[in-house]
Amino acid sequence: MLPTHELSRVATVKQPQDSEINSSFLSVLLLLFICHILTLNAQTNLETFNWFNELGASLPSWLLLCVTDLGDGITAGALILICLTYKPQWLYRVIVTTLLCALCVHFLKQYFDAPRPAAVLEVINIIGKARYEHAFPSGHTTTAFALAGVIWLLADKLWCKLSVLMLAVAVGLSRIAVGAHWPEDIAFGAILGWLLAYLACGAVPLSTLKLKYQYWIIFALSMIVLVSELKHLGKDPFSVLLFNRYLIITALISLTVYMCSKFQLSDKPHK
């Protein structure tokens, strides 16, 4: 069994090849730019919205709510913290990505103050709470692609990279299906999140703290996520979202408590 500092050192050294990462990452970025250019045409933007929104009307509401909730800050935060329990050396990069994402989305939404589909269209399929302003860019999509970008840059397995990317795409499309955003909002949000992940991972080093300290930080962040969700208790009328979030948060806290106790015990001297 390797000591704690050795485990941290090995985890830090083992990274994928930069050239392979950059080429695949930039390929995804190119596809996102093409999608964004297409949505700049007003007619294409409207027709694409109508198609996906009508498709959403034929799908179960609970399914769309669960998928779209994966891009919510609380739910996404809980999910990425679960990932951090397995890859704690990603800690600094995830924190910086999250902060950049929150700041950029807030600023752009306030600056553009673009109307949402519900404020423009008379006939629309809305699932969840109707919103009318601050459409551009999609915060859920930006969050989903930012966290997917971090995992894409840092994970070793191709199936893991593709899985998180497909989840991020599903979150973006679900925002159209529930009537919350235009395709243009989704495409730009995806580009923004993807670029922020690249910026954070390129500028911020991997964590070199002892594993037990990393896990205690993750535990503290888990408590922040829990308190944030409790503050919203009773405000969201959709029970499926509450069940979805509490299930994820319960798994997160259980896992972080286990990992904290595990590495706390491993640091105790043997008698």
Summary of predicted features, one role per range:
Residues 54-69, 95-98, 185, 242-248:
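Loop-to-helix transition at the N-terminal end of transmembrane alpha-helices
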Residues 128-267:
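Membrane-embedded catalytic cores of phosphoryl/pyrophosphoryl-handling enzymes
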Residues 1-75, 107-133, 263-271:
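N-terminal transmembrane-helix/juxtamembrane module of multi-pass inner/ER membrane proteins
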